[in-house]
Protein backbone atom coordinates (compact mmCIF):
# COMPACT_ATOMS: atom_id res chain seq x y z
CA UNK A 1 0.00 0.00 0.00
CA UNK A 2 2.86 2.38 0.82
CA UNK A 3 4.34 1.75 -2.62
CA UNK A 4 0.97 2.59 -4.21
CA UNK A 5 0.84 5.88 -2.29
CA UNK A 6 4.11 6.87 -3.98
CA UNK A 7 3.66 5.26 -7.41
CA UNK A 8 0.24 6.76 -8.17
CA UNK A 9 1.22 10.35 -7.24
CA UNK A 10 4.29 10.01 -9.46
CA UNK A 11 2.06 8.86 -12.34
CA UNK A 12 -0.31 11.76 -11.64
CA UNK A 13 2.66 14.11 -11.77
CA UNK A 14 4.43 12.85 -14.88
CA UNK A 15 1.66 11.63 -17.22
CA UNK A 16 0.72 15.21 -18.21
CA UNK A 17 4.41 15.93 -18.86
CA UNK A 18 4.63 12.88 -21.14
CA UNK A 19 1.53 14.14 -22.95
CA UNK A 20 3.17 17.56 -23.38
CA UNK A 21 6.35 16.06 -24.85
CA UNK A 22 4.46 13.78 -27.27
CA UNK A 23 2.20 16.58 -28.52
CA UNK A 24 4.99 19.15 -28.91
CA UNK A 25 7.11 16.85 -31.07
CA UNK A 26 4.55 14.61 -32.79
CA UNK A 27 1.16 16.28 -32.28
CA UNK A 28 0.48 17.28 -35.89
CA UNK A 29 1.43 13.83 -37.17
CA UNK A 30 -1.02 11.99 -34.91
CA UNK A 31 -4.72 11.29 -35.67
CA UNK A 32 -6.88 14.24 -34.53
CA UNK A 33 -3.59 16.05 -33.82
CA UNK A 34 -3.13 13.97 -30.68
CA UNK A 35 -6.00 15.37 -28.63
CA UNK A 36 -6.77 11.82 -27.46
CA UNK A 37 -3.27 11.59 -25.97
CA UNK A 38 -3.89 14.69 -23.86
CA UNK A 39 -7.40 13.74 -22.79
CA UNK A 40 -6.48 10.12 -22.07
CA UNK A 41 -3.49 11.00 -19.90
CA UNK A 42 -5.37 13.63 -17.89
CA UNK A 43 -8.47 11.47 -17.35
CA UNK A 44 -6.16 8.66 -16.18
CA UNK A 45 -4.61 10.99 -13.60
CA UNK A 46 -8.10 11.85 -12.35
CA UNK A 47 -8.93 8.19 -11.73
CA UNK A 48 -5.59 7.70 -9.97
CA UNK A 49 -6.35 10.72 -7.76
CA UNK A 50 -9.87 9.40 -7.12
CA UNK A 51 -8.40 6.08 -5.99
CA UNK A 52 -6.07 7.89 -3.58
CA UNK A 53 -9.00 9.93 -2.27
CA UNK A 54 -11.13 6.82 -1.65
CA UNK A 55 -8.22 5.17 0.16
CA UNK A 56 -7.83 8.29 2.29
CA UNK A 57 -11.53 8.14 3.26
CA UNK A 58 -11.46 4.41 4.03
CA UNK A 59 -8.25 4.58 6.07
CA UNK A 60 -8.63 8.08 7.50
CA UNK A 61 -5.68 9.16 9.63
CA UNK A 62 -5.12 12.93 10.09
CA UNK A 63 -1.40 12.48 10.62
CA UNK A 64 -0.61 10.07 7.81
CA UNK A 65 1.92 11.10 5.17
CA UNK A 66 4.09 9.41 2.58
CA UNK A 67 7.14 10.79 0.85
CA UNK A 68 10.00 10.08 -1.50
CA UNK A 69 12.98 12.18 -2.52
CA UNK A 70 16.33 12.04 -4.27
CA UNK A 71 19.45 14.17 -4.10
CA UNK A 72 19.67 16.63 -7.00
CA UNK A 73 22.64 18.80 -5.98
CA UNK A 74 24.96 17.53 -3.25
CA UNK A 75 27.97 19.69 -2.41
CA UNK A 76 29.78 19.82 0.91
CA UNK A 77 28.06 22.99 2.11
CA UNK A 78 24.99 22.97 -0.11
CA UNK A 79 22.43 20.27 -0.81
CA UNK A 80 19.14 20.28 -2.70
CA UNK A 81 16.75 17.34 -2.71
CA UNK A 82 13.72 17.00 -4.97
CA UNK A 83 10.80 15.00 -3.67
CA UNK A 84 7.09 14.55 -3.16
CA UNK A 85 4.90 14.67 -0.06
CA UNK A 86 1.57 12.83 -0.04
CA UNK A 87 -0.82 13.58 2.82
CA UNK A 88 -4.54 14.27 3.16
CA UNK A 89 -4.25 17.88 1.94
CA UNK A 90 -2.24 16.75 -1.08
CA UNK A 91 -4.74 14.04 -2.04
CA UNK A 92 -7.76 16.37 -1.87
CA UNK A 93 -6.00 19.05 -3.91
CA UNK A 94 -4.83 16.52 -6.51
CA UNK A 95 -8.43 15.36 -6.93
CA UNK A 96 -9.61 18.92 -7.62
CA UNK A 97 -6.77 19.75 -10.03
CA UNK A 98 -7.13 16.54 -12.04
CA UNK A 99 -10.95 16.75 -12.11
CA UNK A 100 -11.08 20.34 -13.36
CA UNK A 101 -8.23 19.68 -15.80
CA UNK A 102 -10.05 16.61 -17.17
CA UNK A 103 -13.26 18.61 -17.62
CA UNK A 104 -11.32 21.39 -19.34
CA UNK A 105 -9.65 18.96 -21.74
CA UNK A 106 -12.98 17.38 -22.67
CA UNK A 107 -14.70 20.77 -23.02
CA UNK A 108 -11.86 21.97 -25.26
CA UNK A 109 -12.36 19.14 -27.78
CA UNK A 110 -15.28 21.01 -29.33
CA UNK A 111 -14.53 24.53 -28.15
CA UNK A 112 -11.09 24.60 -29.79
CA UNK A 113 -12.02 22.44 -32.80
CA UNK A 114 -10.48 23.85 -35.97
CA UNK A 115 -7.99 26.05 -34.11
CA UNK A 116 -4.76 26.58 -36.04
CA UNK A 117 -2.66 25.56 -33.01
CA UNK A 118 -4.94 22.78 -31.78
CA UNK A 119 -2.27 20.25 -30.76
CA UNK A 120 -0.05 22.91 -29.23
CA UNK A 121 -2.97 24.10 -27.11
CA UNK A 122 -3.41 20.63 -25.60
CA UNK A 123 0.35 20.34 -25.13
CA UNK A 124 0.38 23.53 -23.07
CA UNK A 125 -2.58 22.29 -21.01
CA UNK A 126 -0.51 19.21 -20.19
CA UNK A 127 2.48 21.34 -19.20
CA UNK A 128 0.28 23.44 -16.94
CA UNK A 129 -1.29 20.41 -15.26
CA UNK A 130 2.16 18.90 -14.66
CA UNK A 131 3.34 22.19 -13.14
CA UNK A 132 0.29 22.54 -10.90
CA UNK A 133 0.59 18.96 -9.69
CA UNK A 134 4.25 19.69 -8.95
CA UNK A 135 3.25 22.53 -6.61
CA UNK A 136 0.73 20.30 -4.85
CA UNK A 137 3.15 17.38 -4.40
CA UNK A 138 6.27 19.38 -3.47
CA UNK A 139 7.92 18.43 -0.17
CA UNK A 140 10.38 21.32 -0.13
CA UNK A 141 10.61 24.96 -1.16
CA UNK A 142 12.88 24.39 -4.17
CA UNK A 143 10.58 21.77 -5.72
CA UNK A 144 7.65 24.10 -5.14
CA UNK A 145 9.48 27.10 -6.60
CA UNK A 146 10.48 25.23 -9.76
CA UNK A 147 6.89 24.12 -10.36
CA UNK A 148 5.72 27.63 -9.44
CA UNK A 149 7.80 29.10 -12.25
CA UNK A 150 6.60 26.47 -14.72
CA UNK A 151 3.01 27.46 -13.90
CA UNK A 152 3.97 31.04 -14.78
CA UNK A 153 5.47 29.96 -18.10
CA UNK A 154 2.51 27.78 -19.06
CA UNK A 155 0.05 30.54 -18.14
CA UNK A 156 1.98 32.92 -20.41
CA UNK A 157 1.75 30.43 -23.27
CA UNK A 158 -1.96 29.74 -22.78
CA UNK A 159 -3.12 33.33 -22.21
CA UNK A 160 -1.24 34.29 -25.37
CA UNK A 161 -2.53 31.32 -27.39
CA UNK A 162 -4.15 33.70 -29.89
CA UNK A 163 -1.10 35.96 -30.01
CA UNK A 164 -2.19 37.40 -33.36
CA UNK A 165 -4.49 39.59 -31.29
CA UNK A 166 -2.56 42.43 -29.69
CA UNK A 167 -4.80 42.29 -26.62
CA UNK A 168 -3.96 38.60 -26.01
CA UNK A 169 -0.22 39.15 -26.51
CA UNK A 170 -0.26 42.13 -24.14
CA UNK A 171 -2.32 40.24 -21.54
CA UNK A 172 0.12 37.31 -21.52
CA UNK A 173 3.08 39.63 -21.00
CA UNK A 174 1.24 41.53 -18.26
CA UNK A 175 0.40 38.32 -16.40
CA UNK A 176 3.96 37.03 -16.74
CA UNK A 177 5.65 40.22 -15.54
CA UNK A 178 3.22 40.84 -12.67
CA UNK A 179 3.79 37.33 -11.38
CA UNK A 180 7.55 37.81 -11.59
CA UNK A 181 7.24 40.64 -9.06
CA UNK A 182 5.71 38.20 -6.61
CA UNK A 183 8.24 35.50 -7.47
CA UNK A 184 11.11 37.78 -6.45
CA UNK A 185 9.57 38.04 -2.99
CA UNK A 186 8.99 34.29 -2.93
CA UNK A 187 12.65 33.61 -3.74
CA UNK A 188 13.90 36.08 -1.12
CA UNK A 189 11.67 34.42 1.48
CA UNK A 190 13.05 30.99 0.56
CA UNK A 191 16.64 32.21 0.88
CA UNK A 192 15.94 33.81 4.27
CA UNK A 193 14.55 30.53 5.57
CA UNK A 194 17.44 28.53 4.13
CA UNK A 195 20.08 30.87 5.56
CA UNK A 196 18.58 30.44 9.02
CA UNK A 197 17.62 26.76 8.98
CA UNK A 198 20.02 25.25 6.44
CA UNK A 199 17.32 23.22 4.71
CA UNK A 200 14.67 23.71 2.04
CA UNK A 201 12.48 20.82 3.26
CA UNK A 202 9.19 21.64 4.97
CA UNK A 203 9.75 19.31 7.93
CA UNK A 204 13.05 20.76 9.24
CA UNK A 205 11.79 24.33 8.68
CA UNK A 206 8.58 23.73 10.64
CA UNK A 207 10.48 21.93 13.41
CA UNK A 208 12.97 24.79 13.67
CA UNK A 209 10.18 27.35 13.92
CA UNK A 210 8.34 25.28 16.54
CA UNK A 211 11.43 25.04 18.76
CA UNK A 212 12.49 28.64 18.12
CA UNK A 213 16.15 27.63 17.95
CA UNK A 214 17.36 29.12 14.67
CA UNK A 215 14.78 31.51 13.23
CA UNK A 216 12.48 33.87 15.09
CA UNK A 217 11.23 37.45 15.14
CA UNK A 218 11.88 39.86 12.31
CA UNK A 219 13.70 37.38 10.07
CA UNK A 220 10.78 34.95 10.16
CA UNK A 221 8.29 37.77 9.58
CA UNK A 222 10.22 39.03 6.55
CA UNK A 223 10.56 35.50 5.18
CA UNK A 224 6.83 34.93 5.60
CA UNK A 225 5.93 38.22 3.92
CA UNK A 226 8.32 37.48 1.05
CA UNK A 227 6.72 34.09 0.46
CA UNK A 228 3.26 35.64 0.76
CA UNK A 229 4.20 38.17 -1.94
CA UNK A 230 4.53 35.22 -4.31
CA UNK A 231 1.14 33.94 -3.20
CA UNK A 232 -0.40 37.40 -3.59
CA UNK A 233 0.76 37.68 -7.20
CA UNK A 234 -0.35 34.17 -8.15
CA UNK A 235 -3.71 34.52 -6.37
CA UNK A 236 -4.25 38.02 -7.75
CA UNK A 237 -4.29 39.92 -4.46
CA UNK A 238 -4.18 43.71 -4.15
CA UNK A 239 -2.08 45.45 -5.46
CA UNK A 240 -0.95 42.63 -7.80
CA UNK A 241 -4.51 41.83 -8.90
CA UNK A 242 -4.21 43.77 -12.16
CA UNK A 243 -3.26 40.85 -14.41
CA UNK A 244 -6.21 38.50 -13.91
CA UNK A 245 -9.02 40.43 -15.68
CA UNK A 246 -6.81 40.97 -18.75
CA UNK A 247 -5.95 37.25 -18.75
CA UNK A 248 -9.52 36.61 -19.93
CA UNK A 249 -8.15 37.22 -23.45
CA UNK A 250 -7.07 33.58 -23.46
CA UNK A 251 -9.41 30.74 -24.52
CA UNK A 252 -12.36 30.35 -22.14
CA UNK A 253 -11.46 26.76 -21.10
CA UNK A 254 -8.08 28.14 -20.01
CA UNK A 255 -9.89 30.71 -17.88
CA UNK A 256 -11.89 27.91 -16.25
CA UNK A 257 -8.81 25.81 -15.49
CA UNK A 258 -6.20 28.39 -14.56
CA UNK A 259 -7.95 31.60 -13.63
CA UNK A 260 -10.79 30.11 -11.61
CA UNK A 261 -9.86 26.69 -10.27
CA UNK A 262 -6.15 25.94 -10.10
CA UNK A 263 -3.46 28.50 -10.91
CA UNK A 264 -4.99 31.33 -8.88
CA UNK A 265 -5.67 28.82 -6.11
CA UNK A 266 -1.95 27.96 -5.97
CA UNK A 267 -1.22 30.99 -3.80
CA UNK A 268 -3.93 30.02 -1.32
CA UNK A 269 -2.73 26.40 -1.31
CA UNK A 270 0.84 27.52 -0.64
CA UNK A 271 -0.33 29.79 2.20
CA UNK A 272 -2.17 26.85 3.76
CA UNK A 273 0.73 24.44 3.25
CA UNK A 274 3.30 26.88 4.69
CA UNK A 275 1.04 28.33 7.39
CA UNK A 276 3.49 27.59 10.28
CA UNK A 277 6.03 30.08 8.90
CA UNK A 278 3.69 33.07 9.25
CA UNK A 279 4.18 35.12 12.42
CA UNK A 280 1.29 37.11 13.98
CA UNK A 281 2.62 40.29 12.34
CA UNK A 282 2.75 38.61 8.93
CA UNK A 283 -0.76 37.19 9.41
CA UNK A 284 -2.08 40.68 10.19
CA UNK A 285 -0.71 41.99 6.89
CA UNK A 286 -2.13 38.96 5.06
CA UNK A 287 -5.57 39.52 6.60
CA UNK A 288 -5.61 43.20 5.60
CA UNK A 289 -4.54 42.37 2.03
CA UNK A 290 -7.23 39.70 1.75
CA UNK A 291 -9.94 41.96 3.15
CA UNK A 292 -9.05 44.87 0.86
CA UNK A 293 -8.98 42.56 -2.16
CA UNK A 294 -12.35 40.98 -1.33
CA UNK A 295 -14.12 44.35 -1.05
CA UNK A 296 -12.32 46.17 -3.88
CA UNK A 297 -12.72 43.42 -6.47
CA UNK A 298 -16.41 42.91 -5.71
CA UNK A 299 -17.06 46.64 -6.18
CA UNK A 300 -15.19 46.62 -9.50
CA UNK A 301 -17.12 43.53 -10.64
CA UNK A 302 -20.50 45.30 -10.46
CA UNK A 303 -19.26 47.93 -12.94
CA UNK A 304 -18.27 45.41 -15.63
CA UNK A 305 -20.40 44.44 -18.63
CA UNK A 306 -18.17 41.72 -20.10
CA UNK A 307 -19.24 38.28 -18.87
CA UNK A 308 -15.70 36.94 -18.39
CA UNK A 309 -14.46 40.08 -16.65
CA UNK A 310 -17.37 39.91 -14.21
CA UNK A 311 -16.33 36.35 -13.39
CA UNK A 312 -12.67 37.38 -13.21
CA UNK A 313 -13.28 40.11 -10.63
CA UNK A 314 -15.62 37.77 -8.76
CA UNK A 315 -12.76 35.28 -8.62
CA UNK A 316 -10.38 37.92 -7.27
CA UNK A 317 -12.91 38.79 -4.57
CA UNK A 318 -13.39 35.15 -3.56
CA UNK A 319 -9.62 34.66 -3.40
CA UNK A 320 -9.52 37.68 -1.11
CA UNK A 321 -11.89 35.87 1.26
CA UNK A 322 -9.58 32.84 1.26
CA UNK A 323 -6.51 34.95 2.01
CA UNK A 324 -8.44 36.79 4.74
CA UNK A 325 -9.25 33.41 6.30
CA UNK A 326 -5.55 32.46 6.22
CA UNK A 327 -4.66 35.79 7.83
CA UNK A 328 -7.12 35.24 10.66
CA UNK A 329 -5.70 31.77 11.29
CA UNK A 330 -8.66 29.80 9.92
CA UNK A 331 -6.66 28.12 7.17
CA UNK A 332 -8.95 25.07 7.13
CA UNK A 333 -11.84 27.33 6.09
CA UNK A 334 -9.61 28.89 3.41
CA UNK A 335 -8.82 25.44 2.02
CA UNK A 336 -12.48 24.38 2.10
CA UNK A 337 -13.54 27.50 0.22
CA UNK A 338 -10.71 26.94 -2.28
CA UNK A 339 -12.22 23.54 -3.12
CA UNK A 340 -15.82 24.71 -3.39
CA UNK A 341 -14.89 27.82 -5.37
CA UNK A 342 -12.82 25.80 -7.84
CA UNK A 343 -15.85 23.73 -8.75
CA UNK A 344 -18.55 26.38 -9.08
CA UNK A 345 -16.36 29.01 -10.73
CA UNK A 346 -14.97 26.58 -13.30
CA UNK A 347 -18.55 25.64 -14.19
CA UNK A 348 -19.49 29.32 -14.51
CA UNK A 349 -16.62 29.81 -16.96
CA UNK A 350 -17.73 26.76 -18.95
CA UNK A 351 -21.22 28.30 -19.13
CA UNK A 352 -19.78 31.63 -20.28
CA UNK A 353 -17.79 29.75 -22.92
CA UNK A 354 -20.99 28.16 -24.21
CA UNK A 355 -22.63 31.60 -24.41
CA UNK A 356 -19.63 33.14 -26.21
CA UNK A 357 -19.13 30.20 -28.57
Predicted regions: what is each one?
Residues 1-10, 25-123, 196-217, 242, ...:
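Transmembrane helix-loop-helix hairpins at membrane boundaries of multipass inner-membrane proteins
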Residues 2-8, 16, 34, 141-143, ...:
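Hydrophobic alpha-helical transmembrane segments of multi-pass integral membrane proteins
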Residues 7, 11-14, 18, 22, ...:
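Residue-level signal for short hydrophobic patches within transmembrane helices
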Residues 13-27, 102-103, 232, 294:
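N-terminal signal-anchor/start-transfer transmembrane helix
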Residues 18-38, 156-170:
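Cytoplasmic juxtamembrane interface segments
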Residues 103-144, 153-357:
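Hydrophobic transmembrane alpha-helices and their helix-loop junctions in integral membrane proteins
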Residues 149:
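Short phosphate-coordinating micro-motif centered on Lys-Gly-acidic
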Amino acid sequence: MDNMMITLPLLILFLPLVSFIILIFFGKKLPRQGDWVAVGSIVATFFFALYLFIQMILEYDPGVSHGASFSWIDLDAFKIDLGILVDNVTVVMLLIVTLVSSCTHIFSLKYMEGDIRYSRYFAYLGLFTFSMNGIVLADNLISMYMSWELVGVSSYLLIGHWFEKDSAADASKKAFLTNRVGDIGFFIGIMLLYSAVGSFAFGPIFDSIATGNTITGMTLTLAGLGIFLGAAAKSSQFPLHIWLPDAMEGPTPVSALMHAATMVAAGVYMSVRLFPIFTPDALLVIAYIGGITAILASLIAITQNDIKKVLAYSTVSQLGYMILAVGTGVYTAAFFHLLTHAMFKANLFYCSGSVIH
